[in-house]
């Protein structure tokens, strides 16, 4: 498959995922709609991610053998540490989120993202729905590094996007290169009461 056709196929999968998120948001999607999307994603990953395909074949699962989305093999956590699991070339990924490495510091798990549009779309709706269903913005104090300090941290991305999209005046990051800004946190809390 050429790079152009891979890109076209990847863009179609992405568009369909974004449409699904837009359509269903935090509502329960019909089983048929979720099943169709999960199968589409699985078929794409099976075709373009050799290491995942090898794992699926060892489990005797192919796109043709699926009876429903629950047959799709989840990759064990160690797979993200030992394998390169991406359906597009690593060099074309906008972001690579990594685990903290607490169990194996020299062998951190990696999660590759061609771009962050789907990730961002899947984050903001649930955040608004579950954290702040009755308001547009809230004061947010982030006590961990911002995205600018930790480009490999999904939590850093999550909290940065939450603050950008939902934070009101007075929101901020209180963890900097020198560590936690205790005085800043104290001022933030004093203003909150």
Feature-to-residue mapping (PLM):
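Extreme N-terminal, non-catalytic leader segments
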Residues: 50, 54-68
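Generic detector of short alpha-helix boundary/capping microenvironments
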Residues: 33, 48, 87-88
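Serine-centered coil/turn micro-motif
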Residues: 49-50, 153
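Active-site phosphate/ATP/adenylate-binding loop shared across adenylate-forming ligases
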Residues: 3-27, 59, 68-193
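Alpha-helical scaffold segments that form or flank carboxylate-/histidine-based iron centers
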Residues: 32-42
């Amino acid at each position: 498959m050429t790079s152009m056709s891979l890109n076209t196929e990847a863009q179609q999968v992405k568009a369909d995922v974004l449409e699904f998120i837009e359509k269903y948001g935090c509502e329960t999607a019909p089983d048929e709609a979720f099943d169709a999307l999960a199968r589409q994603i699985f078929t794409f990953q099976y075709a373009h991610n050799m290491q995942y395909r090898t794992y699926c074949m060892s489990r005797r699962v192919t796109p043709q053998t699926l009876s429903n989305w629950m047959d799709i093999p989840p990759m064990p956590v160690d797979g993200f540490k030992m394998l390169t699991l991406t359906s597009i070339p690593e060099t074309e990924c906008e972001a690579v989120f990594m685990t903290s490495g607490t169990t194996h510091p020299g062998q951190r798990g990696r999660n590759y993202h061609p771009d962050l549009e789907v990730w961002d779309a899947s984050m903001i709706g649930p955040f608004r729905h579950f954290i702040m269903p009755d308001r547009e913005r809230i004061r947010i104090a982030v006590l961990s590094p911002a995205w600018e300090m930790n480009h490999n941290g999904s939590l850093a991305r999550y909290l940065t996007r939450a603050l950008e999209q939902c934070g009101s005046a007075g929101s901020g990051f209180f963890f900097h290169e020198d560590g936690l800004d205790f005085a800043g946190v104290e001022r933030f809390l004093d203003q909150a009461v």
